[in-house]
Curated annotation (Swiss-Prot):
Gene3D superfamilies: Metalloenzyme, LuxS/M16 peptidase-like
Record-given protein name: Protein HypA
Gene Ontology molecular function: metal ion binding; metalloendopeptidase activity
Record-linked Pfam families: M16C_assoc (PF08367), Peptidase_M16 (PF00675), Peptidase_M16_C (PF05193), PreP_C (PF22516)
GO biological process: protein processing
Organism of this sequence: Clostridium perfringens (strain 13 / Type A)
């Protein structure tokens, strides 16, 4: 329909209409007349519709009330009176996104779906959740999601428990996370940004139930809301629904949700903090330093885009001068930079990890001297061109991976809208990009550096140093504090607390009423496609090399992958495959030093990457295919240069430049150490798979904890000639025509252009024939306890079901949904307090269950062991099974970006997995019934009896359970 400014549509006044050419949409900005709720609809042809409602929620302390509320409002509401409507939606919706997020100054609730009926259902449940939550009726919601005193018997130890409490204990375990929480405290000390909206575990137990509900009353009102709609949905219908069902029932309310601005400093602040490490760890090379500059108004689109480019130019590019200067000076092992435009005043951070103790002044001097040198002598124009091109490529490509476009646009809109700026300023980039391109012939970036960094007193230098025993001390203090609290309770109070825990358990264990479950809107099986999505793949040949062509529209961008089978690499050299991938593209070559190579890559492509990857041969048990994958994306017009660069890197990288190679090894080691804290569940599950499958054992050597140990050892041993010789040998074994496969995504016309150009690379590739290795890894029950200074655990258990004679069925994917959203969710998250838990049954036989930020070990493993009993007793009516089936099919039908489509198709090809197999899998999901789910009980029982476990987490907790492990060792070296 034709919308007109100043007209009223279902209670919403249309304030303005704006063409958003960069994203191919039209922005309609409304205000609700009665409540003054703000609403934006971006009209688009995109069928992946998005809805979000957000609120300004500046915290007044660090008890985490915004975060706890974000969890809690999704635990039942006026119309949807189940314990967790959110989980019911996860079970049975076709959503393409469903989540909620707490930021330092806002809380948002976004959903997305391609199905219109589903989209309206999601919008209904979310609006009811935020405006009419059951938190006022059930204090147990606050106890479960936030915190409570946990004690079952009078003689037991008193503990704290709660989902957010445990989540934040995990978040505060990582030095990276600690640093990123300290930085805002130093540059915004007088604002809400100095506080933890997520919650400081030391402060969370200070939050009362009364303060919790008061926060909702104050901020969760339409007058303080920012509502967003995106896609090809019926706008009038959407506005009418929001008004009639919700907003018309509210009056305008004056709400003070002002986000205060920090006054500038007269001089740079310098602050130092500590984090805990184990007694066995070395204090050296464990410090973190950051320089932080407040840039200014987040609603300035040009400045925001310019600093996105500058962050890449100074710290992220392989040619980045700040990174190079700091690494060359030996200050630290990994350098990164970040421009944060999601707060009222944006900030730019330069950060170094794994640095020596007490080097903060040297760090500051190197950064400031480098910046001054760039201003005085000018930034290399080629580096400027490369950095602008990289950022521009990403903007124009608009590939946000698995995230819906609408969600990304909402986040960009909120970066200005929340602060009363032009909501579209970060979407409309063309004008700003043209201004920034003037940097190629002016001092544009030099002036920014001088003004906002060199001469900026609103800045801070933050140091984070390791300290032994700090975590043990805090743990002992908490234990003592809880003992004192327990001793201060009279008998009546203690009985009340025990009684409250019982009531909470009863509520958690009581099934929802049938009528309440049926209040949650859901789709029927008629709403899902019976046919699996087919990605076009045609097997062709270019000069004798098998080439897979995926013919679909890519906006004249080539998405190219070269695969080289690595099964001629001997077992003892397997880790060097991972190392070779980390080095290629970051080292100098015959014709480029590494900085010039980085610039050439960014000028001509959207990136060239290298990775070690494995594929299971699904037609043969425990057989897999290891590959080295080279990927690039580039405009079709730049195909020739992209292929020349791939040849330059593959065939002419200088593997004798050991100074550069050692820098890369140290940086990779530092980044892996960060991942240990942030992705502990991945490490634990990889370990478990390595005990029971050859593929898992190989993956562990190229990307798991074994690979980390390998990097530590070669760095310590400093055997430079051995490293260089091994890399050369592995390179020669891998890059051969006999190992090669090509995958190309793009239309036929572009393919023909690529076909002619790629012949050059094929002609430069060796044609040697090497013997293939037969890998027979030592599998078995290694059961490792991996010690960290974290405060929570990641508990994994698994095995290989095919070794017990079981076969894969699509219904196993359904089982993952049932366990994840019913049994495991209730046993490990709701009752146990873990932040997350999920299972995975791979097509190759590998299987695992893993928890995330879990306060427990034994009770979690007991929950895993009780799965067969749950399955034997499993009951579900037709409605419940339909819900699970729809939710499982959703995982198969997510929108796929152009960059990922070809990856999926080639993974099927290399796994011997056909479209017919995919269709069969889909039918097995759709046709599964209760009996089929029950039939998996023996399989899970056999898996659990194998008793393959790995736990990564708190040292004290693991040592308390030492009988579970065959080997206990510290992770960080």
């Amino acid at each position: 329909m034709n919308f007109k400014e100043n007209n009223i549509y279902s209670g919403f006044k249309l304030l303005n209409i704006e063409n958003l050419n960069e994203i191919g949409g039209v922005g309609l900005r409304f205000e609700h007349e009665k409540t003054k709720a703000k609403l934006i609809k971006i009209l688009s042809e995109d069928d992946n519709k998005c809805f979000a409602i957000g609120f300004r929620t500046p915290p007044e302390n660090s008890t985490g009330v915004p975060h706890i509320l974000e969890h809690s409002v999704l635990c039942g509401s006026r119309k949807f009176n189940t314990k967790e409507p959110f989980v019911e939606l996860l079970k049975g919706s076709l959503n393409t996104f469903l989540n909620a997020m707490t930021y330092p100054d806002k809380t948002i609730y976004p959903v997305a779906s391609r199905n219109e009926k589903d989209f309206m259902n999601l919008m209904d449940v979310y609006l009811d959740a935020v405006l009419y939550p059951n938190i006022y009726k059930h204090k147990e919601i606050f106890m479960q999601e936030g915190w409570h005193y946990y004690i079952e018997n009078k003689e037991d130890e008193l503990k704290y428990n709660g989902v957010v409490y445990n989540e934040m204990k995990g978040a505060y375990s990582s030095p990276d996370s600690i640093l990123y929480r300290k930085i805002p405290q130093t540059i915004y000390p007088d604002t809400c940004y100095a506080l933890s909206s997520g919650g400081d575990p030391d402060e969370i137990p200070n939050l009362t139930y009364e303060e919790f509900v008061e926060f909702h009353k104050k901020y969760y009102h339409p007058s303080n809301s920012y509502i967003f709609l995106y896609g090809n949905g019926d706008t009038e219908k959407e506005l009418e629904f929001i008004n009639e069902e919700y907003l018309k029932n509210f009056e305008y309310k004056e709400i003070d949700s002002e986000i205060k601005e920090q006054k500038s400093f007269e001089s740079m602040k310098e602050e130092s903090f500590t984090y805990g490490i184990a007694e066995s760890e070395d204090l050296n090379h464990k410090s973190y330093y950051s320089l932080n500059f407040v840039i200014g108004d987040a609603t300035d689109g040009e400045k925001g885009l310019a600093f996105d480019v500058l962050a890449y130019l100074l710290t992220r590019s392989t040619a980045a001068p700040l990174k190079k200067a700091l690494i060359d000076a030996g200050i630290g092992k990994a350098v990164s930079g970040d421009f944060d435009n999601s707060t009222k005043q944006s900030a730019f951070t330069v950060l170094v990890k794994n640095a020596e103790l007490n080097k903060e002044e040297e760090f500051k001097k190197v950064v400031m001297d480098t910046l001054k040198d760039l201003v005085e002598n000018g930034i290399d124009k080629e580096l400027i061109e490369a950095s602008i091109n990289r950022v521009e490529f990403e903007l124009r490509e608009g590939d946000y991976g698995s995230y819906p476009n609408g969600l990304i646009y909402y986040l960009k809109v909120m970066d200005s809208w929340l602060y009363d700026g032009d909501p579209y300023v970060h979407l409309e980039y063309e004008k700003n990009l043209e201004k920034i391109k003037s940097a190629l012939t002016s001092n544009y970036f030099e002036d920014l550096i001088e003004r906002y960094m060199i001469n900026n007193t609103h800045s801070s230098l933050v140091s984070l140093h390791p300290e032994k025993g700090i975590n043990e001390k805090k743990s002992a203090e908490l234990k003592k504090k809880l003992e004192e609290i327990k001793n201060s309770f009279d008998e009546k109070t203690l009985n009340e607390i025990i009684d409250n825990c019982k009531k909470l358990k009863e509520r958690q264990s009581t099934p929802d009423k049938k009528e309440d479950l049926e209040s949650i809107p859901m789709l029927s099986l008629e709403d899902i496609d019976k046919e699996a999505t087919k990605i076009p793949t045609e097997e062709k040949e270019i000069d004798g090399i098998t080439t897979l062509h995926h013919d679909f529209h890519t906006n004249k961008i080539d998405y190219v992958n070269f695969f080289f089978n690595t099964n001629s690499v001997p077992e003892d050299l397997i880790p060097y495959v991972g190392l070779l991938c980390d080095i290629l593209g970051k080292c100098g070559t015959e014709n480029y030093d590494y900085s010039k190579l980085s610039n050439a890559i960014n000028i001509s492509t959207g990136g060239i990457s290298f990775g070690a990857i494995t594929f299971a041969n699904l037609k043969k048990n425990n057989e897999f295919r290891p590959y080295l994958e080279i990927s690039y994306k580039a405009l079709s017009s730049k195909t020739n240069k992209a292929i020349e660069l791939v040849d330059e890197i593959v065939n002419h990288t200088d593997l004798d430049d050991m100074d550069r190679i050692m820098q890369i090894i140290r940086e990779k080691r530092a980044r892996l150490e960060g991942a240990i804290f942030d992705s502990g569940h991945r490490i634990a599950m990889k370990k478990v798979l390595s005990y029971s499958t050859n593929r898992g054992a190989y993956d562990e050597k190229i990307s798991g904890l074994d690979y980390y140990d390998f990097l530590v050892n070669i760095e310590k041993e400093d055997k430079k000639s051995t490293i260089s010789d091994s890399l050369k040998k592995v390179r020669d074994l891998i890059f051969n025509k006999g190992n090669m496969l090509i995958s190309y995504s793009g239309k036929e016309e572009e393919y023909e252009n690529f076909k002619e150009k790629v012949k050059y690379l094929i002609s430069k590739t060796n044609n040697n024939d090497f013997e293939k290795e037969e890998y027979n890894f030592e599998l078995g029950k290694k059961n490792e306890g991996l010690l960290t200074q974290g405060n929570v655990q990641y508990v994994a258990k698994g095995g290989n079901y095919k070794t017990h004679g079981y076969k894969y069925s699509g219904a196993l994917s359904l089982l993952e949904s049932i366990l994840g959203f019913d049994y495991l969710w209730n046993a490990v998250r709701v009752k146990g307090g873990a932040y997350g838990v999920f299972s995975n049954f791979r097509r190759d036989g590998g299987a695992y269950i893993v928890s995330y930020r879990d306060p427990n070990i034994k009770s979690t493993l007991e929950a895993y062991d009780n799965i067969p009993k749950y399955l034997n007793d499993f009951e579900a009516d037709e409605r419940e099974m339909t819900k699970y089936i729809i939710g499982t099919i959703r995982k198969y039908d997510q929108p796929i970006s152009n960059g990922i489509k070809g990856d999926i198709a080639v993974s099927y090809y290399l796994s011997n997995f056909t479209y017919e197999d995919l269709q069969k899998e889909r039918e097995e999901i759709i046709n599964a019934d209760v009996e089929k789910i029950k039939s998996f009980a023996p399989m899970i029982k056999d898996l659990m009896k194998e008793d393959y476990i790995c736990v990564l987490g708190n040292e004290e907790k693991i040592k308390e359970n030492k009988d579970l492990f065959n080997n206990i060792k510290s992770v960080i070296k």
